[in-house]
Amino acid sequence: MCYYISILIYWGADCRTVGTGPVLMYCTKTIRSYFRCRHPFFSSINSSQIFFLSLLIAGECMFIPSAWPRVSTFHRLFIPALALLPYVFLYASVVTKSYITHENHEDEMARYPYDRVIFNPGHRCRTCDFLKPARSKHCSFCKACVSRHDHHCVWLTNCVGRNNYHYFLSLLLSLSLMLAYGSWLGFSLVSQTLEGLIPSSSPLRSKSQDWTTWLNVWAIAIASDIRVGAVAMLTAMTAPLAMAFLLYHTYLIWAGMTTNESAKWSDWKEDVADGLVFKSTRSEIYGNQSHSDEDTPAQRTWPVSSNQILVITDGEPPKEGFQLCSRSNEILQKDDPQAPVDTRWTEVNSMREIDNIYDLGFWDNLREVFHMPIRRCVR
């Protein structure tokens, strides 16, 4: 059985891209050529989406007709809703773009302030030919800068960014609910089949039976109700994966960061562990001097600001006479081995000492993701 499944997976999808096997490539080219230019969803469809949709549609076509006559009215209300929602959010996630263009660039520059930790001002995208807004990233697959870039999703053939992140979260939630509900309902129906085949009073279903007998009994029930049983097994195996993705993105919202930003914070964590990061305050370093690139609409309207300055050195604390780099967190030490240490700087020993101005607290982070008004006042 495992051998035939392996052959099927190979012909259906390559292990690296989940979508370059001969069958899926043929289906993808056929569908794309037929629907090309008719709608953004079909013009950007790829093998990964064909593979995903094929599993989803085939599973529902196997499960629902077989289960429908056997479930109550309550379940008949839930099944259509849970079956259709993933398609709605998948569609919205694919067709909604978060691209930064010359037309909306000014608005994007005013959306988020630069924290001068993982995002510094003054960096220009050489491909798009404009300054990079805070929290943005250029995607080489989409060939565009993406607002509040999270990641490029191969299953969507689209970047997950500010405009479609809430659709992506809703897709994960609806998939998790559908898979969990499907596995529970499926095994409930298979249990009914098992009761008809082997009553609970049978010695084969005694509490003292060994694992081999238990597996054989359930194998008989699943084989007798193959449409429901096979889909129930598939949903039971895939539900933890969807839930794990949902939990991971819930954690990212709680932490006030994106997938892209979590990688940047990981780099800072390594530098902190190596003793390369030092901190001070803007008031100590600059005094009452103001800087033109700090007085921006985003700086004035974003609810959280920080007085902290971070620098990365070669392990030596900043010395008197150093120079700060305007576009990075590096410094130029004074070319004098005898220069005294600048006492305004202290070594950062933990990531907890570093401010994340994009973290507004879980509920406000969630409201910001869903484009709802943030309740916190500017401070």
Swiss-Prot record:
The broad enzyme category this protein falls into is transferase
* Alphabetized UniProt keyword annotations: Acyltransferase, Endoplasmic reticulum, Lipoprotein, Membrane, Palmitate, Transferase, Transmembrane, Transmembrane helix
InterPro entries according to UniProt: Palmitoyltrfase_DHHC (IPR001594), PFA4/ZDH16/20/ERF2-like (IPR039859)
Q: Where is the DHHC domain?
A: 123-173
Q: Which residues lie on this side of the membrane: Cytoplasmic?
A: 26-48, 98-166, 249-379
EC number(s): the record gives 2.3.1.225
List the membrane topology term(s). Multi-pass membrane protein
Q: Which GO terms describe its cellular component?
A: endoplasmic reticulum; endoplasmic reticulum membrane; Golgi apparatus
**Classification via PANTHER family:** PALMITOYLTRANSFERASE SWF1, ZINC FINGER DHHC DOMAIN CONTAINING PROTEIN
Cite a single GO MF annotation. protein-cysteine S-palmitoyltransferase activity
Species in which this protein is naturally found: Aspergillus fumigatus (strain ATCC MYA-4609 / CBS 101355 / FGSC A1100 / Af293)
Q: Does the keyword Transmembrane helix apply?
A: yes
Question: What family is reported?
Answer: Belongs to the DHHC palmitoyltransferase family. SWF1 subfamily.
- Which superkingdom does the taxonomy of this entry point to? Eukaryota
Asked if the record carries the keyword Nucleotidyltransferase, the reply is: no
- Reactions it catalyzes: L-cysteinyl-[protein] + hexadecanoyl-CoA = S-hexadecanoyl-L-cysteinyl-[protein] + CoA
Query: Its function?
Result: Palmitoyltransferase that targets several endosomal SNAREs. Palmitoylates the SNAREs at cysteine residues close to the cytoplasmic end of their transmembrane domain. May have a role in the cellular quality control of transmembrane domain-containing proteins.
Q: What is known of its domains?
A: The DHHC domain is required for palmitoyltransferase activity.
Q: Which region is the signal sequence?
A: none
Please state what the protein is called: Palmitoyltransferase swf1
Q: Where in the cell is it found?
A: Endoplasmic reticulum membrane
Gene Ontology annotations of biological process type: protein targeting to membrane
List residues in topological domain: Lumenal: 1-4, 70-76, 188-227
Q: Mind telling me which residue stretches traverse the membrane in this protein?
A: 5-25, 49-69, 77-97, 167-187, 228-248
Give the active-site positions.
C153 (s-palmitoyl cysteine intermediate)
